[in-house]
């Protein structure tokens, strides 16, 4: 497939193609502008892939700019986390990391220009009064009594704000546009507010901070952004974006284009709700493998390639829709099926003893991937006592059950055919040991007499087993749209994390965090980066071998 054929097609790329063909632009310059007040989630991944992907495909540039205009909510911890997430996803920003705070001096000068043009004024209404005066979707707003102050008075008052002469909430700078506008965003929006808080980049230099809508468009223009891409909730804000740039002296006027945000089933994207999950300890942190954060997905075992593929598949449109969780899971399942080496682990172990097996044991050869001989093979120890999964044995079963049944045969993966002879139980009637015999002439081959053995189960040698903790992660919520519930916390899936103590083949003692494996017949797993120790590895289930939720929804 050629490079052109491999590129996704969407309405934004069509606009860019037209702009380049007409000569409106000779290059493409985009940006990704997160606020450093939290961790990025899968919705941000869509924006990252769009902005950086466009720059990559058109051989342009993409800036990473932190919209750091609210020092109360922001932290350098989030800055570093976001930079790490962007790089982990496989993208690199153009030049240095940028901050909106880099432009605070220019933004202040542009605010003064608007005051001098009679297009901005210092308002002393309280925040509550400003909301009241703004009106509603059906009722126009009304002018502030401070709206008609002179230019000189507004300049003096704005300087007083700058010098710390007002308390927080006692004054702000507003644009003078139209309080009767059908668009609430155009009803004299606030441009600057007072916050006595230390800023992670500028320290205590400023006590007035520009609002997002004032900062964003000017930052785009100062950086020479050609296509400013944002989600649909900012559609009305485009009017203010254009108004600001039309009324200041700036040589470049970027254009804003909106696309639909990513909504994903069985999770929430609201920063407030995600924060509540963390602070109320429903999850163990922002990187909990059940969270939709990029750090959570990474810890769970999602690869950057699978997330990029997911963003490519869902596409870019202007129509809001909700994506099935199965779509995301399908991307990682396909990736790991292709690339993850195989290993054996028993999640719910029961002891199996092969009574006629002689000797200390032996090594059996197993391929690391059944379809990729280039991935090599490994030696796995086999002995007379092994662990198998409790679900792989029944005393009685129908013909559909293809695993081990009392009096019948099954094959041990890449080893021998065995037959269950008897069981031993505890006082409560639970099976503690399964006693078997084996056919010594069936190591990785069919029985010589031609009898058919259909079932295959996995196993781990008891003498060589690595004790492991296995964390079976599942969807965090039990309903597709938890955000619609009166209390979204009430629909948390109680089975979203089930912890098991099992055994794994000894090769897994060399596993490293983030390295994925297919535990044969169980699913895809990776070593946990937070809880694993050399003595007790912890493996997280990334995704099952198939979509078990599909049956639930039928």
Swiss-Prot record:
Keyword Repeat assigned: no
Q: Does the keyword Membrane apply?
A: no
Identify the EC number(s): 6.1.1.18
Subcellular location per UniProt equals:
Cytoplasm
Question: What's in the keyword line of the UniProt record?
Answer: Aminoacyl-tRNA synthetase, ATP-binding, Cytoplasm, Ligase, Nucleotide-binding, Protein biosynthesis
According to the UniProt entry, the coiled-coil residues are: none
Q: What are the GO MF terms of this UniProt record?
A: ATP binding; glutamine-tRNA ligase activity
Which GO CC terms are listed, alphabetically? Answer: cytosol
- Where, in this chain's numbering, is ATP bound? 35-37, 41-47, 231, 261-262, 269-271
Q: What is its main location?
A: cytoplasm
> Could you tell me what reaction this enzyme catalyses?
tRNA(Gln) + L-glutamine + ATP = L-glutaminyl-tRNA(Gln) + AMP + diphosphate
- Residue sites binding L-glutamine per the record: 67, 212
The record's Pfam families line, in alphabetical order, gives: tRNA-synt_1c (PF00749), tRNA-synt_1c_C (PF03950), tRNA-synt_1c_C2 (PF20974)
Q: Which GO terms describe its biological process?
A: glutaminyl-tRNA aminoacylation; glutamyl-tRNA aminoacylation
Give start-end ranges for motif 'KMSKS' region. Answer: 268-272
> What sort of enzyme, by top EC class, is this?
ligase
Instruction: Give the residue ranges of motif 'HIGH' region.
Output: 34-44
Assembly notes: Monomer.
Stated family? Belongs to the class-I aminoacyl-tRNA synthetase family.
Q: Which NCBIfam families match?
A: glnS, PRK14703.1
PANTHER family per the UniProt record, alphabetical:
GLUTAMATE--TRNA LIGASE, GLUTAMINE-TRNA LIGASE
The protein's name in its UniProt record: Glutamine--tRNA ligase
């Amino acid at each position: 497939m050629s490079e052109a054929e491999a590129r996704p097609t969407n309405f934004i790329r069509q606009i860019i193609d037209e702009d380049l063909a007409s000569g409106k632009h000779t290059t493409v310059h985009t940006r990704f502008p997160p606020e450093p007040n939290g961790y990025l989630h899968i919705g941000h991944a869509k924006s990252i892939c769009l902005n950086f992907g466009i720059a990559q495909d058109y051989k342009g540039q993409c800036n990473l700019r932190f919209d750091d205009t609210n020092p109360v909510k922001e932290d350098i911890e989030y800055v570093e986390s976001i930079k790490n997430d962007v790089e982990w996803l496989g993208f690199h920003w153009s030049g240095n990391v940028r901050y909106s705070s880099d432009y605070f001096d220019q933004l202040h000068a542009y605010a003064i220009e608007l005051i001098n043009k009679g297009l901005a004024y210092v308002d002393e209404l309280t925040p509550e009064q400003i909301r009241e005066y703004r009106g509603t979707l059906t009722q126009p707003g009304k002018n502030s009594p401070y709206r008609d102050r002179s230019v000189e008075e507004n300049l003096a008052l704005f300087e007083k704000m700058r010098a710390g002469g007002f308390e927080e909430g006692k004054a702000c700078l507003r644009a003078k546009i139209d309080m009767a506008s059908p668009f609430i965003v155009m009803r004299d929006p606030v441009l600057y507010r007072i916050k006595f808080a230390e800023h992670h980049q500028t320290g205590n230099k400023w006590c007035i901070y520009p609002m997002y809508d004032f900062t964003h468009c000017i930052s785009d223009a100062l950086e020479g952004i050609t296509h400013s891409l944002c989600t649909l909730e900012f559609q009305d804000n485009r009017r203010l974006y254009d108004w600001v740039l039309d009324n200041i002296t700036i040589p470049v006027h970027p254009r804003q284009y909106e696309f639909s945000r990513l909504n994903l089933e069985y999770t929430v994207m609201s920063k407030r709700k995600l924060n509540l999950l963390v602070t109320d300890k429903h999850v163990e942190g922002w990187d909990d493998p059940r969270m939709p954060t990029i750090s959570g997905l990474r810890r769970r075992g999602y690869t950057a390639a699978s997330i990029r593929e997911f963003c490519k598949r869902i596409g870019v449109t202007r129509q809001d829709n909700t994506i099935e969780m199965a779509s995301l899971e399908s991307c990682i399942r396909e990736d790991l099926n292709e690339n993850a080496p195989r290993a054996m682990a028993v999640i719910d172990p029961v002891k199996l003893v092969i009574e006629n097996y002689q000797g200390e044991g032996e090594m059996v050869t197993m391929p690391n991937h059944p379809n990729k001989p280039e991935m090599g093979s490994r030696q796995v120890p086999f002995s007379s006592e092994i662990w198998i999964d409790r679900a792989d044995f029944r005393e009685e079963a129908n013909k559909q059950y293809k695993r081990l049944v009392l009096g019948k045969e099954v094959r041990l993966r890449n080893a021998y055919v065995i037959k269950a002879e008897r069981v031993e139980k505890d006082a409560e009637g639970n099976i503690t040991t399964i006693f078997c015999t084996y056919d010594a002439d069936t190591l990785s081959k069919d029985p010589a007499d031609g009898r058919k053995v259909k079932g295959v189960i996995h196993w781990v040698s008891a003498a060589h087993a690595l004790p492991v903790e296995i964390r079976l992660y599942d969807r965090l919520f039990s309903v597709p749209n938890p955000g619609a519930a009166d209390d979204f916390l009430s629909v948390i899936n109680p089975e979203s994390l089930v912890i098991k103590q099992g055994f794994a083949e000894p090769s897994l003692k060399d596993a490293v965090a983030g390295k994925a494996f297919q535990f044969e017949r169980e699913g895809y797993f990776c070593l946990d980066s937070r809880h694993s120790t050399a003595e007790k590895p912890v493996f997280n289930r990334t995704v099952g071998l198939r979509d078990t939720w599909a049956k639930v929804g039928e």
